Amino acid sequence: MSNQACFSNPGPELWNALGWHPSSEQLEQMIALQALLRQWNARVNLTRLVEGGDYWIMQVFDSLWPLQSELQNAQQPRRCIDIGSGGGFPGLVLAIALPGARITLVDSVGRKTAALKAMAAKLGLTSRVTVRSERAEFTGQDPCCRGLFDLAMARAVSTAPVVAEYLVPLLKPSGEALLFRGHWSPNDAKDLAKALRLLQADLIKMERRELPDNRGVRHQLRLRATLPCPATFPRPIGVPAKNPLGS
């Protein structure tokens, strides 16, 4: 697995490394998503990672590896939300892999949400995928979203304290927040712990994973609320990023 050609049509070694194998229909949808990204990238800057291993490892594999438990119970009804969905990762890939899930995709860039809606329709996912064009701070205070999700996630959005402030208010009492991280250090952990005390949530899992083909190291962080999130969070638009909790 040393070059792009190895993943022009992924073989079983990729799925063996993941510990999950898509059905033929799911694989076709993932290949179709790749083609749609190529088309939309000509109009909207969604992602540069659309070819070969860039797509199959850096996008698909990286979106799914933290979700082992969910993948083993793929038909289970659950509500998920992806904040800062961008080109649809992890949200659209998750919608393909978890046929029992309803997925909400959130992005503040109108051109990206238009692309997400169009791609979801082409993939036959419209009945289970909702797209919202708005800032995450608004989503977290909207009664239609606040406190309603089994899984809230964000990938490549901001620092961990900022992302936690976006995600924790969205969780139902039994729900979990999933933060996709690259580098993770003791100082990062200290900063997140300060934020979680204010959000009344705990870090329940941290897992490190090396991507196939020497594509780098990733971490997943799982959070769970200990008490209802204080109504003041998330703070008004722009404040979480300018003044991260605990800083």
From Swiss-Prot:
It is found in: Cytoplasm. Specifically methylates the N7 position of a guanine in 16S rRNA. InterPro entries: rRNA_ssu_MeTfrase_G, SAM-dependent_MTases_sf. It is an enzyme of class 2 (transferase). Keywords: Cytoplasm, Methyltransferase, rRNA processing, S-adenosyl-L-methionine, Transferase. The keyword Heme does not apply. GO terms for molecular function: rRNA (guanine-N7-)-methyltransferase activity. Its EC number is 2.1.1.-. It comes from the Bacteria. This is Ribosomal RNA small subunit methyltransferase G. The keyword NAD does not apply. SUPFAM superfamilies: S-adenosyl-L-methionine-dependent methyltransferases (SSF53335). HAMAP family: 16SrRNA_methyltr_G. It holds the Pfam family GidB. S-adenosyl-L-methionine binds at G84, F89, A136, E137, R155. GO terms for cellular component: cytosol.
